[in-house]
A protein has these predicted regions:
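Active-site neighborhoods and metal-handling regions in enzymes and metal-associated proteins
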Residues: 1-225
Length: 225
């Protein structure tokens, strides 16, 4: 948005318009709410409390009050959570706001189904670790209250993943933009993560070999593939 505005000398103004698809797409699926699981240090190396301490130190060193994470893979890494809200991606549709005093995870999409004990257990574990779980749809109101009430005067966001709807409600005076430190940090794998990657590659290799064997034998036998 800023690049476009600067390129045309500020002559283009973006506005938040109603979602016109809602009128046409009457059977539009609801936001997914798949089971949420948590991972322990034996699976990821760093416990979430350690990651929160790390990001808070980063905020202190930079002189910022808070960071808003909008990239789903970064949120999954920060909280050691996994889901299936996006097909073939182990992520949860959510936003994460970390301040020096609070960790707000906007992930709840309504009541947890009675048969989803996994998510309920995961939420209890997160709450015990100081993660305040909010409704997914409450993120805009929460950000507005924090910024308008001067509770946050230096909010760090990554413009590469921040959507326009959230950008439009943030006071630009209080927003610092840059590359997310979480994406950079999670790219440096610890020993546990490296071991997990090796195991995953082995399993993936076995699956690929089985597929190639099936493909070759099927073609040689004249079967339809």
């Amino acid at each position: 948005v800023k690049d476009i505005q600067e390129a045309v000398g500020g002559k283009v103004h973006f506005v938040n318009a109603p979602d016109m698809l809602e009128v046409l797409w009457t059977d539009r699926p609801e936001i997914p709410q798949t089971p949420v699981i948590t991972l322990g240090p034996e699976q990821v190396g760093w416990p979430r409390e350690q990651k929160v301490r790390w990001i808070r130190k980063w905020l202190t060193d930079k002189g910022y009050d808070a960071i808003l994470l909008t990239a789903l893979d970064e949120i999954a890494w920060m909280l050691n959570v996994r889901g299936q809200d996006v097909a073939y991606n182990p992520v949860v549709m959510s936003y994460l706001l970390v301040t020096q005093d609070n960790v707000l995870w906007f992930a709840r999409k309504g009541e947890i189904p009675d048969d989803d004990g996994e998510t309920e257990d995961s939420f209890h574990e997160l709450l015990a670790d100081g993660v305040n779980i909010q409704e997914y749809s409450d993120v805009e109101a929460a950000l507005s209250n924090l910024v308008d009430g001067n509770y946050i005067k230096a909010l760090f966001v990554d413009p590469a993943t921040l959507n326009f709807s959230l950008f439009s409600i943030l006071n630009s005076r209080y927003v610092i933009m840059g590359t997310s430190p979480v994406g950079l940090r999670k790219s440096v794998k610890n020993e546990v993560e490296i071991a997990g990657m090796r195991e995953a590659h082995l399993e993936d290799g076995v699956a690929m070999e089985r597929f190639l064997h099936w493909l070759q034998t099927s073609v040689e036998a004249g079967d339809a593939v």
